[in-house]
């Protein structure tokens, strides 16, 4: 058995070793002072995801202003739409796949996000190919690279949910959660 002072010294030396920082990703929320709309951002292990509420009338205006068939504009109704920005802040290659992401409503039900290929296939049947507006369904990108576009969930305006998402970094899959998100209201909120 080691003498008591040797054990104490060992414990003391262990206490001096650097402890790796425990990673705690923080969700930030901001309210636009002019529109009253909300935006959320979370950076977790170098994967940055930002979601910005978009009013249904704004989304309709974006598609209408491109002289797209009315059926394309109407296809977006009934969807909760966010302006989305994904950025790699990791120092290595990241990739993601929107088809793996889910919105979980307070009743526990999981809702798929509609992906860019699904929208493009639907819009082609309606006489349009306007896929550039939707967040790429998959991406693999280096440090500093980013992707942006609309993300869509078939939920009514004002719906609340948590977003479960995932990404890969150095071949390892990570999962994240953005809690207490809300679809934009049907009408603009009153500015505070």
Residue ranges and their predicted role:
Residues 1-7:
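N-terminal secretory signal peptides that target proteins for export/translocation
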Residues 24-192:
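Conserved functional micro-motifs across diverse proteins
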């Amino acid at each position: 058995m080691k003498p008591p002072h040797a054990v104490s010294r060992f414990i003391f030396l262990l206490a001096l070793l650097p402890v790796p920082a425990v990673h705690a990703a923080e969700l930030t929320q901001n309210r636009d002072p002019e529109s009253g709309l909300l935006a959320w951002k979370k950076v977790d292990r170098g994967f940055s995801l930002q979601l910005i509420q978009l009013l249904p009338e704004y989304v309709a205006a974006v598609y209408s202003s491109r002289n797209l068939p009315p059926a394309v504009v109407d296809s977006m109704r009934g969807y909760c739409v966010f302006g989305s920005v994904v950025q790699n802040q990791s120092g290595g290659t990241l990739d993601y796949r929107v088809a793996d992401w889910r919105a979980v409503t307070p009743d526990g039900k999981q809702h798929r996000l509609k992906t860019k290929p699904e929208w493009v296939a639907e819009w082609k049947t309606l006489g349009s190919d306007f896929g550039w507006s939707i967040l790429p369904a998959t991406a693999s990108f280096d440090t500093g690279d980013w992707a942006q576009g609309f993300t869509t969930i078939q939920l009514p305006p004002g719906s609340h949910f948590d977003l479960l998402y995932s990404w890969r970094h150095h071949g390892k899959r990570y999962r994240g959660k953005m809690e207490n998100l809300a679809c934009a209201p049907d009408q603009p909120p009153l500015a505070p």
